[in-house]
Amino acid sequence: MTTAQFICLSLGSNLGNRFEIFRKAFALLKELEIEDLQSSIILETKALLLPGSPKEWDLPFFNSVLIGKTTLSPKQLLSGVKQIERRLGRDVNALPWSPRVLDIDILLYGDENHQQEDVKIPHERITERPFLLSLIASLCPTRIFHKPGSEYHLKSFGEIAHLLPCPQEMILNSFSPNTLLMGVVNVTDNSISDEGLYLEASKAVAHAEKLFAQGASVIDFGGQATNPKVQQLLNVEQEWSRLEPVLKLLAEKWAGRRQYPDISLDTFYPEIIKRALEIYPIRWINDVSGGSKEMAEIARDANLLLVINHSCSLPPRPDKTLAFTTCASDQLLSWGEKQIEAFVALGLRQDQIIFDPGIGFGTTQIQALNVLHKMKKFRKLGCATLVGHSRKSCFSLLGKYDAKDRDWETVSLSVLLQQQGVNYLRVHDVEANQRVLSAAAWSGVHV
C-alpha cells in the first residue's frame, strides 16, 4: 500500500473572477486524489514582471498556498495540476510572465528533492517569493525545508519566513478563501440602510467598483426594496426602469475587463432576468421569493446560479412567520430539500442552486439568530449556501442601533458563519467583512 505524502501547492491567478477560479480549482484538486486539503488565506499582490513587460500585464495576482496528502507520484501530481489549469482556461501558448487564469505550482512533496527537467521540488523560486513563505508558515510553521546546498536547508518555514519577511508594500489585500462575499448595491429609494444613495446608474456602478476592489466576488444589484417598511411592491416596468440604465452602463464600462466579479440581480420577476441577459452577461439570480418554476427554467437554460431565498411573505409581515412549535432551522431544511428536489427535476443542476435561509423573511428576530448559529445543518442539502445577515433587524436584540450602524454585529456573525462552512455572505460593508474573515482564516481552512 502506497503511503500518502505531504504536499504543498501554490495557486495564482490574475485574470477573470479570481475568487471563483480558486473555488473551482479547490474542487478539482480534491477530485485529484488529494486528501485533507487546506488553504491559506488569499493574498493579493502586485504582479511580478520582467523589465520592459507590456503595461497591460500589470494586473494584481491572487495567491494562496494549499497543503494536503496524496498517493500520487510527483509526475502524476504535475500532470494532474496541469490538466486542471487547462480545464479552467489557462492558455498554454501564452507568453511567460503574461497574465493567466490559473497557475498551480508544486512547492513541496514530502521531504524529497526532485530535480528533474520537468519536476523541480522544492520549487526553485520558493525562497524568492516571501509572500508564499509567509503563507506556508501560516499553515505549517514547524515543517522543515529540505534542500541541500541552500542556506535555509533544515530550517523551519516559520524561521525562514521570519528571515525573509514579506515587504508590506507587496501585499495589496488579503481575503478569505472559503467564504466569499456578495456586495449589495440597492438601486432603490426605500432601502433601510442606504436609501436613495445609488438610484443613479453612475453612482450604482461606482459603488460596485468600490465593492469589487474591496474583495466582493459577486455584486448583487436590486431595484426593489423588500423590507418590512415597504407598503407596495414595484411592478416589472418600474423595477426595470431602475435596473436597465445600470446594466447598460455596466456593459459600456466593463466590456473587455480582464478582472471582474460575477453580477447578480436581486429580483423575483423572470421577465427582468430575460431582459437583463440581452444587455449584460449576469451570472446569478437572487430570488427572494424562493424561486419559481419559470425562474428555475431560465437559470437552467442560461446556465445561471439561482439563489433560493426562503420567505413567508413579500414584503415581510410580522404575522407571517415560521411556526413556533418546531425548530426554525428544521423547517427551513425541509423547505430547502423540497425546493431543490423540484428544481433538479426540472433539469437544474444541484451545483447551480444556492440555498439562503432568508434571514428576516419570515423568521422572527429570535428565530433568525438561532438559524445563524445552526447554519452547519444545511450542508445536508448538498448545495452551496448563502446568508444575508448584514444589518438585519435581529441585531436589535443586542442593542438599539440604526441599520447602518449594525456592522459590528454583522462581522462578528460573519466569522461564525465562516466557521460553519457557509459559502457566500451577502453584505453591505465588504471591506470590514473581508478583513475580519481573512484574519480569522489565517491558520488555514479546509476547502
From Swiss-Prot:
Alphabetized UniProt keyword annotations: ATP-binding, Folate biosynthesis, Kinase, Magnesium, Metal-binding, Multifunctional enzyme, Nucleotide-binding, Transferase
Transmembrane spans: none
Protein name stated in the entry: Folate synthesis bifunctional protein
UniProt family annotation: In the C-terminal section; belongs to the DHPS family. In the N-terminal section; belongs to the HPPK family.
One record GO biological process: folic acid biosynthetic process
GO molecular function list: 2-amino-4-hydroxy-6-hydroxymethyldihydropteridine diphosphokinase activity; ATP binding; dihydropteroate synthase activity; kinase activity; metal ion binding
Keyword Magnesium: yes
EC number: 2.7.6.3, 2.5.1.15
Annotated region (HPPK), positions in chain: 1-165
Binding site for Mg(2+): N186
Pathway: Cofactor biosynthesis; tetrahydrofolate biosynthesis; 2-amino-4-hydroxy-6-hydroxymethyl-7,8-dihydropteridine diphosphate from 7,8-dihydroneopterin triphosphate: step 4/4; Cofactor biosynthesis; tetrahydrofolate biosynthesis; 7,8-dihydrofolate from 2-amino-4-hydroxy-6-hydroxymethyl-7,8-dihydropteridine diphosphate and 4-aminobenzoate: step 1/2
Binding site for (7,8-dihydropterin-6-yl)methyl diphosphate: T226, D266, N286, D356, K392, R426, V427, H428
GO CC list: cytosol
Region DHPS, residue ranges: 181-447
Catalytic activity: 6-hydroxymethyl-7,8-dihydropterin + ATP = (7,8-dihydropterin-6-yl)methyl diphosphate + AMP + H(+); (7,8-dihydropterin-6-yl)methyl diphosphate + 4-aminobenzoate = 7,8-dihydropteroate + diphosphate
Cofactor: Mg(2+)
Enzyme class: transferase
Pfam family, one: Pterin_bind
Pterin-binding domain span: 179-438
PROSITE patterns: DHPS_1 (PS00792), DHPS_2 (PS00793), PTERIN_BINDING (PS50972)
